[in-house]
């Protein structure tokens, strides 16, 4: 079966975008760090030169401080350079993996099956990382050599920040907001505002009203024009720090806000890093199961309906397998306009040379494959045995099946 490589690229797009986004963010960190440190060092040197009356000890102390700062900058830059090298390596590996499709012309070829197996392992590892199974995902990546195709570090940091929010700690999420402030602002995100509001609310809960006022003056001025109603609602807590349930302010004081902050962080994290909100493994399973799902897959095995009896013999259908049958219950049925009738004995299509026949119990097989199977199993003359139930029926009781 021929295929077009570009049809497969859509599943690789999120990983490629994430690699480029990591490179962009890392470059911004390098640029911002260099600009800040250069400004500080130049300002210190200018001040040192202009202070002609300063003692030698004071000058030596400032020079030592500068040397220490330069050493710290060097270590920081080395760390950022190592991160950049890692992101470049990951990007190159993902592009090479995607480029392997160019030499494949058949979806049934061994090359495409090997490529698909690697992709499946990557999708499973991504799913496990997104759901907190970091240890299992790391082992899978190591065994399958997927370290450069799966963003283990990204998901680990996400889990760390998400868990810290649920533990009512805001330091990690504020640090993340600071690193990505530009893109959060571009996306009109309110994550940092909500995190700052939560810190303000916690100060009020602790009866630290003076500290809460100082905190509001220091951090809320930026959002005063954009979110005045939200800030006014929070400011009312200074005058009325306790409210009964059902009041307009009770939601601000509720512990449910921590769940809300964790959910808000998740949506912002996926938007910043171009991570699909629904795992690709979910999307692929849903599409595949829905394309194969028919009413026959969900007939009761104890039903006397002949279709229910026949459905138990279709072992090639993925939707009929116990592990996938439950997953497909909520999915729509396939919109099939042209059916292919398959022999349950051989898995091959039925045609005029191997026309379908039905036993009295309702089970249907191809006549030629049924005769061949019975000859191989020594059925007595004039009878045919049902391969599924093992019962024998006279040949004349078989009925020809017509598909309309």
Swiss-Prot record:
One of the record's GO molecular function terms: ubiquitin protein ligase activity
Pfam family, any one: CTLH
Subcellular location: Cytoplasm; Nucleus
Cellular component terms per the entry's GO annotation: cytoplasm; cytosol; GID complex; nucleus
Catalytic activity entry: S-ubiquitinyl-[E2 ubiquitin-conjugating enzyme]-L-cysteine + [acceptor protein]-L-lysine = [E2 ubiquitin-conjugating enzyme]-L-cysteine + N(6)-ubiquitinyl-[acceptor protein]-L-lysine
Stored InterPro entries: CRA_dom, CTLH/CRA, CTLH_C, Fyv10_fam, LisH, ZF_RING_GID
Every CTLH domain range: 154-211
GO biological-process terms attached to the record: negative regulation of gluconeogenesis; proteasome-mediated ubiquitin-dependent protein catabolic process
Pathway: Protein modification; protein ubiquitination
Catalytic activity, EC: 2.3.2.27
Keyword Zinc tagged: yes
Top-level class of the enzyme under EC nomenclature: transferase
Residue span, LisH domain: 116-148
Zn finger limits (RING-Gid-type): 317-389
Highest taxon of source: Eukaryota
Keywords: Cytoplasm, Metal-binding, Nucleus, Transferase, Ubl conjugation pathway, Zinc, Zinc-finger
Primary role: Component of the GID E3 ligase complex recruiting N termini and catalyzing ubiquitination of proteins targeted for degradation. GID E3 is regulated through assembly with interchangeable N-degron-binding substrate receptors induced by distinct environmental perturbations. Required for the adaptation to the presence of glucose in the growth medium; mediates in association with the substrate receptor VID24/GID4 the degradation of enzymes involved in gluconeogenesis when cells are shifted to glucose-containing medium.
PANTHER family, per database record: E3 UBIQUITIN-PROTEIN TRANSFERASE MAEA, MACROPHAGE ERYTHROBLAST ATTACHER-RELATED
Summary of subunit composition and partner proteins: Identified in the GID/CTLH complex. In the absence of stress, the complex exists as an inactive anticipatory complex (GID(Ant)), composed of Gid1, the E3 ubiquitin-ligase Gid2, Gid5, Gid8, and the RING-like subunit Gid9, awaiting a substrate receptor to form the active E3 ligase complex. When cells are shifted to glucose-containing medium, the substrate receptor Gid4 is induced and becomes part of the complex, named GID(SR4). Additionally, Gid7 transforms the GID(SR4) E3 ligase core into a higher-order supramolecular assembly (Chelator-GID(SR4)).
Recorded family membership: Belongs to the FYV10 family.
Protein name: GID complex subunit 9
Species in which this protein is naturally found: Schizosaccharomyces pombe (strain 972 / ATCC 24843) (Fission yeast)
Phylogenetic lineage: Eukaryota, Fungi, Dikarya, Ascomycota, Taphrinomycotina
Gene this protein is translated from: gid9
């Amino acid at each position: 079966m021929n295929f077009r490589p570009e049809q497969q690229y859509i599943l690789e797009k999120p990983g490629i975008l994430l690699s480029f986004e990591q490179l962009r963010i890392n470059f911004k960190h390098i640029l911002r760090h260099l600009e800040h440190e250069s400004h500080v060092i130049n300002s210190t040197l200018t001040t040192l030169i202009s202070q002609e009356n300063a003692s030698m000890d004071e000058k030596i102390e400032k020079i030592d401080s500068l040397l220490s700062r330069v050493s710290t900058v060097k270590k920081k830059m080395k760390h950022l350079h190592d991160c950049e090298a890692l992101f470049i390596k990951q990007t190159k590996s993902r592009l090479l993996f995607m480029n392997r499709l160019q030499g494949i012309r058949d979806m049934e070829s061994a090359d495409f099956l090997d490529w698909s197996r690697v992709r499946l392992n990557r999708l499973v590892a991504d799913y496990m990382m997104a759901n907190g199974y970091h240890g299992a995902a790391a082992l899978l990546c190591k065994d399958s050599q997927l370290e450069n195709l799966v963003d283990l570090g990204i998901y680990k940091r996400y889990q760390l920040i998400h868990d810290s929010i649920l533990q009512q700690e805001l330091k990690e999420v504020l640090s993340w907001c600071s690193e990505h402030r530009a893109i959060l602002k571009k996306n009109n995100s309110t994550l940092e505002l909500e995190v700052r509001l939560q810190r303000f609310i916690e100060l009020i809960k602790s009866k630290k009203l003076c500290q809460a006022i100082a905190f509001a003056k220091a951090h809320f001025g930026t959002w005063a024009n954009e979110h005045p109603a939200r800030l006014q609602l929070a400011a009312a807590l200074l005058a009325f720090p306790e409210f009964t349930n059902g009041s307009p302010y009770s939601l601000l004081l509720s512990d449910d806000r921590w769940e809300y902050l964790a959910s808000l962080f998740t949506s912002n994290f996926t938007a910043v890093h171009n991570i699909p909100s629904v795992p690709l493994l979910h999307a692929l399973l849903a599409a595949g199961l829905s394309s194969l799902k028919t009413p026959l897959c969900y007939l009761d095995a104890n039903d006397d309906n002949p279709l229910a009896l026949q459905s138990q013999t279709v072992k090639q259908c993925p939707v009929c397998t116990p592990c996938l049958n439950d997953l497909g219950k909520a999915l729509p049925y396939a919109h099939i306009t042209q059916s292919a009738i398959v022999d349950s004995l051989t898995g091959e299509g039925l045609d005029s040379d191997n026309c379908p026949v039905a036993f009295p119990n309702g089970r249907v097989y191809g006549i030629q494959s049924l005769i061949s199977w019975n000859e191989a199993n020594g059925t007595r003359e004039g009878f045919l045995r049902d391969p599924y139930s093992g019962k024998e029926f006279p040949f004349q009781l078989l009925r020809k099946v017509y598909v309309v």
